[in-house]
Swiss-Prot record:
Ca(2+) 1 binds at D77, D79, D81, Y83, E88. One of its GO terms (molecular function) is calcium ion binding. It is found in: Cytoplasm, Cytoskeleton, Cilium axoneme; Cell projection, Cilium; Cell projection, Cilium, Flagellum. The gene is clxn. Ca(2+) 3 binds at D158, D160, D162, R164, D169. This is Calaxin. Keywords: Calcium, Cell projection, Cilium, Cytoplasm, Cytoskeleton, Flagellum, Metal-binding, Repeat. It comes from Danio rerio. Component of the outer dynein arm-docking complex (ODA-DC) that mediates outer dynein arms (ODA) binding onto the doublet microtubule. Seems to regulate the assembly of both ODAs and their axonemal docking complex onto ciliary microtubules. Regulates ciliary and flagellar motility and is required for cilia-driven determination of body laterality. Regulates ciliary motility and is required for cilia-driven determination of body laterality. GO terms for cellular component: cilium; cytoplasm; cytoskeleton; sperm flagellum. It holds the Pfam family EF-hand_5. SUPFAM superfamilies: EF-hand. It comes from the Eukaryota. Disruption phenotype: Knockout mutants show situs invertus but normal formation of Kupffer's vesicle (KV) cilia. However, many of the KV cilia in the mutant beat with an irregular cycle in contrast to the smooth rotary movement in wild-type fish. Signal peptide: none annotated.
Length: 210
């Protein structure tokens, strides 16, 4: 993709996606093209496949849980075609790198709402938490500890007592206690990963400086 095309695309995207100026958006497009490799030169570019993006989530942003990275990919791949378009890529990084608390809450809730019905149910909490607890083989019911944690989470988050967590419940919980933003699994990069990525993407490239 030549410089003029990148500039035009950056101009369009930075009007549609928050938090990045035109120069930064250009950098992210170049990075996207480098991930595409030879495909970037073709007229019909599909995008970055989920396997490659999962690799970035794992190695660049420290998200190591398979179930979570799969959910993150599904949420970010909005048209569900199995590939990340350049717009989906920039939108994801907008939330990851510079998202407001409100944007991050909406994103995390979507990741945790496994079946997309607008609620986080007991079953969904169990699914997300079951791999995070070390089970003792001697326990009669190895799932008992996870069930206990689910009940504690519901007690803390389910403000309207309907046995599930709505977005309003989740928002109120996180506003009261920010640390509970990623209560059911790591789906955002930590501050160190964000800083390292920004330095790599924006500061080390001359063409990405204003």
């Amino acid at each position: 993709m030549n410089r003029k095309l990148i500039q035009n695309l950056a101009e369009t995207l930075c009007r549609q996606v928050k938090h990045f100026n035109k120069t930064e958006t250009e950098c992210l497009i170049r990075l996207f093209n480098s991930l595409l490799g030879e495909q970037a030169e073709r007229k019909t570019t599909i995008g970055v496949d989920r396997a490659k993006f999962r690799n970035i989530l794992h190695h660049t942003f420290g998200m190591t849980d398979d179930m979570m990275t799969d959910r993150v990919c599904r949420v970010i791949d909005k048209d569900n075609d199995g590939y990340l378009s350049v717009k989906e890529w920039v939108e994801a990084l907008s939330v990851f790198l510079r998202g407001t608390l409100d944007e991050k809450m909406k994103y995390c809730f979507e990741v945790y709402d496994l079946n997309g019905d607008g609620y986080i149910s007991r079953e969904e909490m169990f699914q997300m938490l079951k791999d995070s607890l070390i089970r003792q083989p001697t326990e009669e019911d190895p799932d008992e500890g996870i069930k206990d944690i689910v009940e504690i989470a519901l007690k803390k988050m389910d403000y309207d007592h309907d046995g599930r967590v709505s977005y309003a419940d989740f928002e109120k919980t996180v506003m009261d206690e920010n640390l509970l933003l990623e209560a059911f699994g790591n789906c955002l990069p930590d501050a160190k990963s964000v800083l390292a990525f920004e330095q790599q993407a924006f500061q080390k490239h001359e063409h990405c400086k204003e």
